[in-house]
UniProtKB/Swiss-Prot annotation:
The gene is TRS65. Residues 164-193 are annotated as: Disordered. The keyword Cytoplasm applies. Present with 1660 molecules/cell in log phase SD medium. GO terms for biological process: beta-glucan biosynthetic process; cell wall organization; intra-Golgi vesicle-mediated transport; protein-containing complex assembly; retrograde transport, endosome to Golgi. Its main location: cytoplasm. This is Trafficking protein particle complex II-specific subunit 65. It is found in: Cytoplasm; Golgi apparatus, cis-Golgi network. GO terms for cellular component: cytosol; trans-Golgi network; TRAPPII protein complex. Part of the multisubunit TRAPP (transport protein particle) II complex composed of BET3, BET5, TRS20, TRS23, TRS31, TRS33, TRS65, TRS120 and TRS130. Interacts directly with TRS120 and TRS130. Pathway: Glycan metabolism; beta-glucan biosynthesis. Keywords: Cell wall biogenesis/degradation, Cytoplasm, Golgi apparatus, Phosphoprotein, Transport. It comes from Saccharomyces cerevisiae (strain ATCC 204508 / S288c).
Length: 560
């Protein structure tokens, strides 16, 4: 028996050699790819033998996705060739890739196909009798019950006990299995189980699997308009960059991934009925996206009362990965989700620690009071809306300790800290990581450029150097900011948070050994003109301790 996973999706199976050659050229699989998978049972006419499928298992990252012992569940027989079977069209979307076990941040994902087949007499046509009736189950019959694919359904205590004993015996017998490697191309392995039956064989195929897109759905309610704005955002992932460098353009450094989108669908569903919604701003499809591109489409929904169930939507993205003009891999991603709204955060002041520091050090209503406050350290630590003010970050240290309690000897420093670029131009900053500790570092760099809620009027007055003695005595109330002032502050600090984008987001740094130094080149692009005395939100995550550290305080960027 042979299994073909050809790169070309237009093959109809009329030429076995074309299937084989296209299969040999495949080096990877895309998550949600519409695979053109074939099984060819080539019999032995001299010995009057033929092969039948006994079991099929598909695993992603060692997690079992699906399993079946009946070939009719997933395959259809080709009319003109009774020995050739083709994977059903809906199996990839409904069964094979109905999971989230593939990570798109650069993790080494693997998919494995395991086929167990048996050689039988060609005159013996009762294929069903060869299979264990207790072991015949499929996910199609129970997909509506949302059974976890890595677990086997229990139908009765008697059948479960019988199956358990059989699995135990099979496990003991597999320890004595003799493996015969027929071919190692494309990670193919053929095995013969001579301990139980010399006519039982196993075929294994393993490929790296990549998820090309990062996707998210953001929802916000506008009570004044009685509606919900639902934003569908997606962009190319870190794994797509690895795929491009390793398999698509291994010899070229400046080549980009190319995705051709044919469908971007957002459907409102209710039971069996569904209706497709159009985005507020028209999105022309088909469209083409390249590496580092980001696409957003916003949809408008009716705001429902709190007592009712939230909206449920189905999102579908259909696109093709273009390897070259005559070879494209079809990918179809589809999922259902509820349109949930986050609880609105009230306008609150910053921590009492900052307020107490300001009240103790500020004793003048003039600008000198603010200067004294900066020198005493009160305003140097003040954050407005979660964003460090560049006015007081110019003198920030360029080196920062990762985890003072555990890894106090880890330092970060930007080598080229003073950058001057033109708006829209990409630039690179080199981050030096000095690991003087005795432990290796497993780090990820990411940029979280979000703006938190605006602080209260008390902290804004403190930041402007206004005397707080009257506030301590209760003569001046701590009134909240007006909507106009909040909007002005939002525009003021939006540039700090959103003016620079990290192109190499979720950058996985190779493990830094103890007492070693590593240089990481971080790629940015500036989309808003201005001076940035800090990159607030640029952080490093230690995967071993789950600790975060901000490393953007030592940066200084001027975008013209």
């Amino acid at each position: 028996m042979e299994c073909f996973v050809p790169l070309r999706c237009d093959l109809d199976g009329s030429n076995i050699e074309q299937l084989r050659q296209s299969h040999l050229s495949r080096k990877f699989i895309i998550f949600d790819e519409q695979l053109n998978l074939w099984l060819w049972f080539q019999g032995n006419s001299q010995e009057n033998k033929r092969f039948v499928l006994q079991n099929m298992i598909i695993l992603i990252n060692e997690a079992q996705v699906t399993r079946t012992s009946t070939i009719d569940d997933y395959f259809t027989q080709v009319e003109n060739n009774e020995n050739l079977w083709r994977l059903k069209n809906d199996c990839c979307s409904k069964i094979l890739f109905k999971s989230n076990v593939v990570m798109n941040n650069g993790y080494n994902n693997q998919i494995k196909f395991v086929f167990e087949y048996k050689s039988v007499d060609a005159n013996f046509n009762n294929q069903d009798s060869l299979q264990d009736p207790q072991a015949k189950y499929t996910l199609d019959k129970y997909s509506s019950e949302e059974i976890l694919p890595s677990f086997e359904p229990v139908y009765s205590w008697s059948s479960a006990a019988t199956k358990s004993s059989k699995n135990t015996n099979n496990h003991l017998e597999k320890n004595n299995r003799a493996t015969h490697r027929v071919s190692s191309k494309n990670s193919e392995v053929h095995e013969a189980d001579v301990s139980r039956n010399p006519n039982t064989f196993t075929l294994k195929l393993q490929y790296p699997i990549f998820s090309l897109l990062n996707m998210r759905l953001r929802n916000i309610s506008l009570k004044s308009e009685h509606c919900i704005l639902s934003s569908l955002d997606f962009q190319t992932s870190k794994a797509s960059e690895q795929l491009t460098k390793k398999f698509i353009y291994p010899q070229e450094h400046n080549s980009f991934l190319k995705l051709n989108f044919q469908e971007i669908s957002y459907k409102l569903i209710d039971g069996t009925s569904q209706i497709e919604l159009d985005p507020i701003c028209p999105l022309k499809v088909p469209l083409t996206a390249f590496s580092y591109d980001s696409i957003s489409a916003t949809f408008k929904l009716v705001l429902l009362p709190k007592s009712t169930q939230p909206h449920r939507v189905k999102i579908t993205l259909a696109y093709e990965l273009e390897l070259h003009p005559n070879l494209k891999l079809p990918v179809r991603t589809s999922w259902e989700t509820e349109v949930t709204l986050k609880r609105s955060m009230p306008i609150s002041s910053t921590s009492s620690q900052y307020s107490s520091n300001n009240n103790n050090t500020n004793h003048s209503a003039s600008f000198n009071g603010a200067a004294n406050n900066v020198n005493s350290g009160g305003l140097a630590n003040l954050r407005l809306g979660g964003v460090s003010s560049s006015r007081f970050s110019l003198g920030a240290a360029s080196t920062t300790s990762l985890v003072n309690s555990k890894l106090s000897n880890v330092k970060f420093k930007f080598i080229n800290s003073n950058i001057k670029v033109i708006k829209g131009e990409k630039f690179t900053m080199r981050l030096q990581i000095i690991n003087s500790s005795s432990s290796p570092l497993d780090l990820v760099v990411y940029y979280n450029n979000t703006i938190n809620p605006i602080p209260s009027a008390n902290n804004v007055r403190n930041s402007n150097g206004i005397n707080n003695c009257g506030m301590n005595n209760g003569t001046i109330p701590n009134s909240p900011l007006t909507l106009e002032n909040q909007y002005q502050l939002h525009n003021k600090y939006r540039k700090i948070a959103e003016g620079i984008i990290l192109l190499s987001n979720d950058y996985k740094i190779p493990v830094v050994p103890p007492r070693e130094t590593y240089f990481a080149d971080l790629r940015f692009i500036g989309i808003m003109s201005g001076y940035y005395g800090t990159l607030s939100g640029l952080k490093v995550l230690d995967l071993n301790t789950n600790e975060l550290i901000e490393v953007g305080n030592g940066a200084s960027v001027l975008i013209q």
